[in-house]
């Protein structure tokens, strides 16, 4: 199977730990915070933490969904931590971040699916860090646009929602998520005037034509920024890698995406949703 093939050289990284990495880890740990960097086993954690940046994950570290590509734990989440928004905001201040990225687990167990907690977190970050720009990577909120509006009204600078993969593969790997619902969420964000962003993985068995189709679908609803990265199987229990896409093909996807009309396309094997996110605010 493809997932048992040795990873190509371009996917080998050196995590390395400099003083900034150690300090970032200390701040995250001391505030009892969760990051998608560690829970998602992000290949860029060494680089990002070494620069003093991290993607904070709110709502706890247990997700109500069980997507076949994701390493985040699935189960019954704990009650929300009312102090979490302040802890995240304080950590951002300690890290002296110019740009902060926040994501969350899915909280389908909550009446508002966690949208109120999202809005509180954004406002608290703004209160303690008025000069910091904010990007949020949100769940689909089951397509309930009144909940998406709670996030929009908190006024982050960029709102991202990941399509994850092409239409054909989406039902095979996404738990309780729907391709068209995700498009509707992104379109709703774009129509609000907020800068919109989405991300996909490749290497799941999609074709280049399917990648172009999802680009067209995203552009049709107003998406401005696209990230494309290689899917890496977290464990043997997860969906297998079908292909290791070459750096040349990633470069081709970037060229195609820009020609089609995206304002920014990040496309490379190790690209993840928040990779170089600080550049997307410009």
UniProtKB/Swiss-Prot annotation:
It is found in: Cytoplasm. Signal peptide: none annotated. [4Fe-4S] cluster 2 binds at residues 63, 67, 70. Its cofactor is [4Fe-4S] cluster. InterPro entries: Aldolase_TIM (IPR013785), Elp3/MiaA/NifB-like_rSAM (IPR006638), Lipoyl_synth (IPR003698), rSAM (IPR007197). SMART domains: Elp3. Pfam families: Radical_SAM. Its EC number is 2.8.1.8. Residues 49-263 form the Radical SAM core domain. Pathway: Protein modification; protein lipoylation via endogenous pathway; protein N(6)-(lipoyl)lysine from octanoyl-[acyl-carrier-protein]: step 2/2. It catalyses: [[Fe-S] cluster scaffold protein carrying a second [4Fe-4S](2+) cluster] + N(6)-octanoyl-L-lysyl-[protein] + 2 oxidized [2Fe-2S]-[ferredoxin] + 2 S-adenosyl-L-methionine + 4 H(+) = [[Fe-S] cluster scaffold protein] + N(6)-[(R)-dihydrolipoyl]-L-lysyl-[protein] + 4 Fe(3+) + 2 hydrogen sulfide + 2 5'-deoxyadenosine + 2 L-methionine + 2 reduced [2Fe-2S]-[ferredoxin]. Keywords: 4Fe-4S, Cytoplasm, Iron, Iron-sulfur, Metal-binding, S-adenosyl-L-methionine, Transferase. One of its GO terms (cellular component) is cytoplasm. [4Fe-4S] cluster 1 binds at residues 37, 42, 48, 274. Binds 2 [4Fe-4S] clusters per subunit. One cluster is coordinated with 3 cysteines and an exchangeable S-adenosyl-L-methionine. Its main location: cytoplasm. CDD domains: Radical_SAM. GO terms for molecular function: 4 iron, 4 sulfur cluster binding; lipoate synthase activity; metal ion binding. Belongs to the radical SAM superfamily. Lipoyl synthase family. This is Lipoyl synthase. It comes from Bacteroides thetaiotaomicron (strain ATCC 29148 / DSM 2079 / JCM 5827 / CCUG 10774 / NCTC 10582 / VPI-5482 / E50).
């Amino acid at each position: 199977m493809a997932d048992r093939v040795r990873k190509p050289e371009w996917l080998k990284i050196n995590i390395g730990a400099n003083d900034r990495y150690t300090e970032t880890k200390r701040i995250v740990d001391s505030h009892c915070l969760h990051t998608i960097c560690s829970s998602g086993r992000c290949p860029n954690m060494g680089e990002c933490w070494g620069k003093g940046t991290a993607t904070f994950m709110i709502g706890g570290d247990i997700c109500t969904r069980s997507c076949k590509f994701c390493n985040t734990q699935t189960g019954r989440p704990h009650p929300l931590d009312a102090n979490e928004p302040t802890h995240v905001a304080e950590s951002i201040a300690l890290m002296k971040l110019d740009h902060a990225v926040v994501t969350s687990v899915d909280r389908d167990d909550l009446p508002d699916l966690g949208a109120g907690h999202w809005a509180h977190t954004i406002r608290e970050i703004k209160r303690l860090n008025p000069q910091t720009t904010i990007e949020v990577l949100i769940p689909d909120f089951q397509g309930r646009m009144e909940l998406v509006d709670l996030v929009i009204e908190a006024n982050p600078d960029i709102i991202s929602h990941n399509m994850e993969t092409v239409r054909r593969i989406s039902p095979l790997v996404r738990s309780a998520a729907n391709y068209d619902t995700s498009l509707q969420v992104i379109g709703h964000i774009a129509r609000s005037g907020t800068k919109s962003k989405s991300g996909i993985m490749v290497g799941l068995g999609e074709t280049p034509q399917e990648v172009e189709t999802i680009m067209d679908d995203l552009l049709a609803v107003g998406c401005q920024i696209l990230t494309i990265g290689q899917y890496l199987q977290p464990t043997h229990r997860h969906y297998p890698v079908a292909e290791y896409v070459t750096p040349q093909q990633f470069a081709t996807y970037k060229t195609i995406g820009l020609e089609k009309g995206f304002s920014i396309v990040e496309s490379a094997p190790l690209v993840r949703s928040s990779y170089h996110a600080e550049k997307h605010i410009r």
